[in-house]
Structure formats: structure tokens, C-alpha cells
Amino acid sequence: MTQRASPVSFAGPKRFMKPGISIEELPHIDLIVISHNHYDHLDRLTLEKIYQKQEDQPPKIFVPLRQKKWFEGLDITNVVEMDWWEEQEFEVWKIHAVPVQHWSSRSLWDRNQVLWAGWVLEHPKFRFFFAGDTGYSKDFINLGKKFDGFDLAAIPIGAYEPRWFMKQSH
């Protein structure tokens, strides 16, 4: 839970508030889904701290297509890479990578070189949709139809300015 969403610690967007909970206070985590590779969604130090805390039972991490390579050289294992519409089973869950309207980049030279994804986590008793960052698109209608609706959804609110830049992806 670094202070900046940036490749460097001294520049870039700074956190406005402290996280609501520390890594040490987190309960045991079984799985993590990563929506895309922007620095505010994929933080190396945070993931490393979670793994260190749970080294006996590390969480399984689900990432969009071509994102697994980023984990090479880190002491983080159990990474599962998925393309849109792929499904993996994890314990009683079905994990689905699904399309959303966004993009990926960690530098000026790698725009859209890895995929971004929303996630549907299906349990025998309920369905959860995690959008990550996304603009409004027909994907919402298509996902609702394909999965017969959701019991719970985490959909982003905010990141609207400047509108000319953000309207397609937030």
C-alpha cells in the first residue's frame, strides 16, 4: 500500500488518505484478482507484503492475459493468467475473466501490450462482478445476460476529469 501510484516513490499521484486497514490487519486472503496493470491497481510492494504475511498459504492471483510475466523475478507464485471469457475453478468458485472497457500501460512504451479484465466470481450460492476500472459499454448488458445478473457488483465511481481523456475508460 504505497503512497504513490507511480513507478517511482518521489513523484506521481499521491494517496489522499491512509488505507482503511493495514496489511497486518487483513484477514487470510485466498485469492486476488487484478483488473489491469496501472500502478493504482497493481502494486508490487503490497503484493509482496501480502505474500510474506501468508507465506505458508499464499493467495492465488488471477491476472489478465500477458500479465503473468510481470511477476517473474518476484517471490510471488500461484499466478494464473486468463484471457477474456476463460474460466478457472478455484475451490468452490468459478473465476471468469470478462471484457470491460479500459486499457493497460505501465510506461510510455507498453500501452495495451497486456490485457485488462473485469472478473466474475461465481459461488454455488451467489455471483459477484468486479469491474476494475471501466467506462460504460455494452459489456455491462452482455455480462448481465450471460450470467443472469449478479448478487453483488463492485463498479468504479469517480476518475471523471479531465472528461475528454477519461470518458471512454472511467
Report the location of each language-model feature.
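Active-site metal-binding loops of divalent metal-dependent hydrolases
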Residues: 1, 37, 100-102, 132-134, ...
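Pre-active-site segment of Zn-dependent metallo-hydrolases
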Residues: 1-37, 46-52, 105-111, 137-148
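Conserved S-adenosyl-L-methionine
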Residues: 52-58
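Metallo-beta-lactamase
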Residues: 55, 63-126
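Cap/insert and terminal regions of metallo-dependent hydrolase folds
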Residues: 15, 19, 23, 31, ...
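Glycine/Thr-rich phosphate-binding loops of Rossmann-like dinucleotide-binding domains
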Residues: 42, 105, 163
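Redox-cofactor binding/interface segments in oxidoreductases and associated redox assembly factors
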Residues: 34, 96, 155
